[in-house]
Amino acid sequence: MCTGGSNMGIINSNLTKLGSFLGNEKLYIPEYQRGYSWEETQLDDFWIDLLQIYEENVRDEHFFGQVVIHKNKEDGKRYIIDGQQRISTTIILLDILRTKFKEIADSTNNNDANDDSEDINAKYIGRISDSKKEQYLSMGGVDKEFFFEYVQKRGAIDYTDKKFD
């Protein structure tokens, strides 16, 4: 847990559904946090965790990992103190799903797939356009520009790896 000066505050300590957590309000990763650093081992563990949820049909409750949030009293922003790698990876996965749903919608005129793509965008990633930058996760440091350009902007990354098909 964090300790610090008068602008530090504990939000809560409870279990929250991932969808509610991500779509609640904007999250920030402080500038002092290390950059995104997960490698294949951590990504494999993340994927295995997701597959286990799917295979065991555990949809209601599953401990997805600890996330520590600090709500700064001065600027009112919610900063991720611990759990940034898992949250960032989740947003990357959601971007892949958003892109795949959009590809399905475009190639088959499937309105449900298009709606799913739009829902992911609106609820978890944010609306990004020339006039709007409403991303729900604002990275810090060296990752900020890359994450915005290649993950949060719709369709910026070409996911051609067969692992995602």
How should these model regions be labeled?
Residues 2-165:
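Glycine- and hydrophobic-rich flexible loops that cap the catalytic core of alpha/beta enzyme folds
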